[in-house]
Amino acid sequence: MTTSTSKNAISKSSQEDLCSDTKDKGSSGGGNEANAEASKAIQGFRLVLLFVGLALSVFCLSLVCISEFISTFLFTRTYPDVFGFGRIVQSWLRPFRELRPSLIPLTTWRGSAPLTCYPRVVFSFLLESCTRSSRYGACSLRRWVFSSWDHSSAHLAPSLLLPGLCPCIVAQSVFTDRATWRWCFWINLPLGGVTAVAVFLFVRLPSPQGGATTFLGLLQKLDALGTCILMPLIICLLLALQWGGTTYAWNSWRVVLCLVLFTVLLVAWLYVQYRQGDGGALPLRIVRQRSIRSAILFTFGINGSMFIIVYYVPIWFQAVKDVTAQQSGINFLACSGSMSVAAIIAGTLVSTGEEKQHQGQWRIFNYTTLVSIATGLIWRYNPATSTAYCRAGTLVMFGFGAGSGMQMPFIAAQTVLSASDISLGSSLIILIQTMGGAVFLAVSQNLFQSKLIGLLESHPYGVEPEFILDTGASGLRSAVQHKYGTKAVETVLQAYNTALRQCFLVCIVLACLTIIADAGMEWKNVRAGKKPAKAPDAHHESKTDIK
């Protein structure tokens, strides 16, 4: 009896010693891992240089994006076919940025940090070649093809370009008016070089678990088939929207063929994503999440309306108000400046608000309210509208509303998805951003040209629609006055204003439809941390081993 009792006591003490040893090892291991992660953190001068490099990268990307909005109609001085092939290419090649979801596996490769430098270097030098092109089509083709690769890789880290919009609008306008629009591309050479050096020297990203360790394994993870289907799918859609009712009739065989190909390719792409499961660019488990579906709908609406405003309001300033590109950019600072300020305020409120206030939901509702009112006021623009009303009354309100809601889909993805799915969810939202902008820019362009051509064909002074379209927005008043006389100017400007209001009407519809996404968004605590993966119970394992 005594012997069995002593054996039990010895066994119990040995179990306790083993459990304590296991816990000590686990705690020491966790401490070592924490110390290792802390030692790898970038500090001091390296951190400052890396921050400057990434900031310059955002500046360069914003400059290229803004150049398509403000400088487009000054390019007509060099390229008279801007409303033809050049305009199609600008909307047509935008979906090539849909490479972004397929490039998500690049972040799981152990060499992902230096890999982001190569697109920047190639992109900078090819942008320089754009300035040497003698045809606008070649310039646009090179610019958008290679900017698609650069945006696809660079947006994996700095996904929001809002901080770069304010200085870029003024810088781009000054380049265009005072020097040449080619400086919008030349400036990428020195600034892009600083970014490439900073990232290449100082960024050392750890390889995530489950990531590809070899280049061959990385290629196998890329969704090449889905990407090859997605590109022509959206090209067919945009061509149909671009041609229908303007270049060709809606019942033309070209437009019908594009719509048929779009439908077939869409079914094929969805089938490929279903068959690939989690290995595809669009994992179904992410789309099934309620907040992600709402974020997709919200992003589609917000970016569709924002791209139309950013594109067509500068056109309205240059054509209807007869201002220079520089002054147009300064006027639009009311929108971009308030957008940046609102984004910072909204992000701060979400991160510092009380746990039960669910600030992210209210920021999205603020967007719907403010942008719906602002787009309604913008729709009322006419040749007699004062510049002060445009700046303070409408653009500030629109920018504040857009800035307060633009980041919320990303915050929703970070809140409702697991840590391993955040990159996929964010990439999906960025894909919807570019798709929304591309699709609704094509829709608004179709409405604009159709309305403008219809109004000019019934013009009493015999104004040719082709002449107005080829002239562009910059210098429209002087061109019409020189060819058709002073009496035709006001009528042409009124027709131009009426056609632009069709685009602003699309913004009103998109802004109001985001209320559906507001209702579908879950009320989640955005400050709640992610639940870590459950580690094996050392105490339980030790007992099992002893038994």
Swiss-Prot record:
Region described as Disordered: 1-33
Keyword terms of this UniProt record: Cell membrane, Membrane, Transmembrane, Transmembrane helix, Transport
Localization: Cell membrane
Gene3D superfamilies from the UniProt entry: MFS general substrate transporter like domains (1.20.1250.20)
TM region positions: 47-67, 156-176, 183-203, 224-244, 252-272, 296-316, 330-350, 360-382, 392-412, 422-442, 503-523
One of the record's GO molecular function terms: transmembrane transporter activity
Origin: domain of life: Eukaryota
UniProt membrane topology term: Multi-pass membrane protein
Keyword Membrane: yes
Cellular component GO terms held in the UniProt record: plasma membrane
Ranges annotated as biased composition (Polar residues): 1-17
Family to which this protein belongs: Belongs to the major facilitator superfamily. TCR/Tet family.
Job of this protein: MFS-type transporer; part of the gene cluster that mediates the biosynthesis of varicidin A, an antifungal natural product containing a cis-octahydrodecalin core.
Name of the protein described by the UniProt record: Varicidin biosynthesis cluster MFS-type transporer
Native organism: Talaromyces variabilis (Penicillium variabile)
Gene designation: mfs
